[in-house]
Amino acid sequence: RDSYAVPYISGLVASDSFFALGYAHAQDRLWQMVFSRRMAQGRLSEILGRSALESDILMRTLNIYNLSQKAEKKQSEEINRLLLAYSNGVNTFINEISNSGLGRGSPEFFLYTSQVAPWRPTDSLALMKMMGLLSTNKAKIEILRTRLMLEELDGARLEDLFNEPPLINALETKEYNFFKTSLRPDKNFNESERMLLSQDYTESFLSNINLPASNIFAVGPTRSATGATIAANDPHGTFSAPANFMLVGMSYNSKAAIGATIPGIPAIIVGRNKNIGWGIANAYIDDQDLFVEKINPRNKFEYFTPSGVQKFEKTSEIINIKDENPISIDIRKTKNGPVLAYNIYGVDAVRPEGHEISLSWTGSEEKDRSIEAFISLMMSESIEAGRKNLPLLQVPSQNILLADKNNIGIFTAGAVPKRSRLHTTKGKIPSLGWQKNNGWLGFQLFEEKPFTQNPGSGIVINTNNKTTVREFPYHLSFDWGDSQRIVRATSLLQKRQYHTINSIVEIQNDTVSISAKILLPLLAKQLWFGHPQQFEKAITSQANNALDVLSEWNGDMNPNSPAPLIYASWIREFQKMVIADEVGDLYSNFRNIRPLFLERVLRSTNGASRWCNIKQTEELETCNDISKRALIKSIKPSAI
């Protein structure tokens, strides 16, 4: 290990190094690994109690662990050998702490004293599949869109919020009319299911629709001061202790690789070897669809399909709960996927009486060899070799950055559902499961997905931004990451003709918010040129001082400057005022700043300034009025 405790592993053959990787992961992160395994198995309630029940029900419903057991049999002989070697390394450390009196492996095990079960190859595959689940939000967005439509938000306002055209004549579709006439808020909930979960869905970690972001970019030999390629990646994970990633160096025979691993998964997810470097950015592929399944009123064990009535597949699961009696849950499955019961994802809000909601997800495949895609990158000697196994990636869907000595490229990988051109909702809201043309038709070929390699600009970049302008059903997604980062990063990369490692690091460490540079002048234009009398006397000086500070600000989110704090508080309050008035409790889904939405509102793109008129008042407010109120509230919360 070096001075930062990063392990460097050297083995004679690959299995030796993977054994040592398992040992090092367990040595440093055993609690993290065991906790993640419990989550994938749907067994967190055993140690955390009822508060983890929703997570356990979701994992059991999606069958994460059993699917991973089946996937183990689909791996190549070499991958299974490496998975077993890794598991043996983990278990060697577990045996040491269990049998040799060398402590418990982590302080948390003094609180949760249950015996640590041996690590199995299935465990690693389950963690990979769970990573795919936590990297998508499409089912939750379908539910949110539906609820917003039912709140009478018209197509133009949905376009403002999601920065994508709404469904054509969305308010006239079969699905909308069906939901509008069928949903009865007082009857949608299965009371016995609802009582099972003690926590409100809006307070659940599963309710968050926002995904972590990532940036990948590279310059080719023609844009490098040394004539070598330079690649960079900064995956933005959620804050956690310990961090999601663990840095490791590995070598065996004449091969070597170094980079970021996820404890429990025997692969370098982001890193480099002697010949290539690789990085990842979430591709935001629409990899989930919800279906409304109509229950046969004459037989509750059957549901309607396009070809007639069919029986639900049914299994039961026992979930043990700390300090409580175990519970039994019934899990049903349709041809479209498992039924989301127990208000998973808040689904009861869009589940009509006499119907269920099922989920199709690309991670539900048994033939999932995603882990091989990353392990093969560790051993690749060129872009072409690295690209060869990317079609194996099922979940999580990613834009993969590859760079060798002479080439750079970004390739979209991960399963993309094939949908019919006649799909009635295009996957934007739940579709009717008994209507033909709504079900999936398999998956797109890897060759059909977007990629860029050695462009004339000598630069490749992705910041979770839109990667294709193809129309449905070849569109990949309707929901993408923001577009501000791609603008800023492209500008910085184009600023220099030739880059060095230092200039790339400088871009990675850039703290200028292009969103702030765009939005602040729109937000403050009237106030900067107004008069002190427009503010209540008690806070005139504070408001004007804040405006003075912001007038000298260049958008740099420097933590030592007061300007970013003033701006962030102001813009957040402004967004809350204009959205919460329209959507009520659903505002919890819009707590993250939405720069494109705010720019549309402040510029009144297609009349979007109508958001500034507060429904709860009789007066007709403008965006200048709301901007002023938001500034006052952000400076002195009790003022309004």
Where does each model-flagged region fall?
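Substrate-recognition/specificity elements adjacent to catalytic centers across diverse enzyme folds
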Residues: R1-I230, P235-T238, G259, E573
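Glycine- and hydrophobic-rich flexible loops that cap the catalytic core of alpha/beta enzyme folds
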Residues: I209-L211, N215, M250-P263, A267, ...
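Proteins synthesized as precursors that undergo proteolytic processing into mature forms
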Residues: E54, N63-N66, S87-N88, E372-S397, ...
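Glycine- and acidic
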Residues: S68-E77, I230, E366-S376, V469-L476, ...
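Gly/Pro-rich active-site capping loops and adjacent beta-alpha segments
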Residues: P7, G11, D16-Y65, G279-D330, ...
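Charged, long alpha-helical assembly modules
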Residues: L565-I640
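Structured, non-membrane catalytic/scaffold regions adjacent to prosthetic-group chemistry
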Residues: K74-S98, T222, G227, P235-T238, ...
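Hydrophobic alpha-helical segments
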Residues: P338-L340, A349, H355, L393-R496, ...
